[in-house]
């Protein structure tokens, strides 16, 4: 399994269990998810052991159903909010941080990143009202923000991440 982590914070953003594709210019990674519902807080009787029928029936523990996009739920991404002005301020600082990190780990990626990132940012800002914003589990404001949108069908969610803001960890 391959886990994609934020190079700034080390937060897990997504893994290779999803359908992943790279944008034409190689700047963005698009990860397709799906809407899911799952119970949380439920304890499986098989894990407890013993003979449940011989004991007094208990109401069990509270369980809640959580619904959302599988990428967000599985990797504990935290929702945040931006408008055009605040995202512009964030992305300027983020691009500087990624550039500095790339100079350390992949100097050959600095020029392509700085040349192509502004066009991607312009596309994002032009479509900003459609996006939901998610940060990693640590909620570090300096880290990567994943952008969630839905395909034209209105049902299929996908997330966008800056490729150069990710590090790959093989498990």
From Swiss-Prot:
Compartments, as annotated in UniProt: Cytoplasm
Keyword Transmembrane helix listed: no
One matching Pfam family: TCTP
Assigned keywords, A-Z: Calcium, Cytoplasm
Endpoints of the signal sequence: none
Top-rank taxon, per record: Eukaryota
Main location: cytoplasm
Gene3D superfamilies named among the record's database cross-references: Metal Binding Protein, Guanine Nucleotide Exchange Factor, Chain A
Role description: Involved in calcium binding and microtubule stabilization.
InterPro entries xrefs: Mss4-like_sf, Mss4/transl-control_tumour, TCTP, Translation_control_tumour_CS, Translational_control_tumour_p
A GO molecular-function annotation: calcium ion binding
Stated family: Belongs to the TCTP family.
PROSITE patterns in alphabetical order: TCTP_1, TCTP_2, TCTP_3
Keyword Cytoplasm applies: yes
Identification of the protein by name: Translationally-controlled tumor protein homolog
């Amino acid at each position: 399994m391959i886990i994609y982590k934020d190079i700034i914070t080390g937060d897990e953003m997504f893994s290779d269990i999803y359908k992943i594709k790279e944008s034409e210019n190689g700047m963005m990674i698009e990860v397709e998810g799906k809407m899911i519902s799952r119970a949380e807080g439920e304890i499986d009787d098989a894990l407890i052991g013993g003979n449940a029928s011989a004991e007094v029936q208990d109401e069990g523990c509270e369980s809640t159903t959580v619904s959302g996009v599988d990428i967000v739920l599985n990797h504990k991404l935290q929702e945040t909010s931006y408008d055009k002005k605040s995202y512009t301020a964030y992305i300027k600082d983020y691009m500087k941080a990624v550039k500095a990190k790339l100079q350390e780990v992949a100097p050959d990626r600095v020029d392509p990143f700085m040349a192509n990132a502004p066009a991607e940012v312009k596309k994002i800002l032009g479509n900003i009202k459609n996006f939901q914003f998610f940060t990693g589990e640590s909620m570090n404001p300096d880290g990567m923000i994943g952008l969630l949108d839905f395909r034209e069908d209105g049902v299929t969610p996908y997330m966008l991440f800056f490729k150069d803001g990710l590090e790959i960890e093989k498990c």
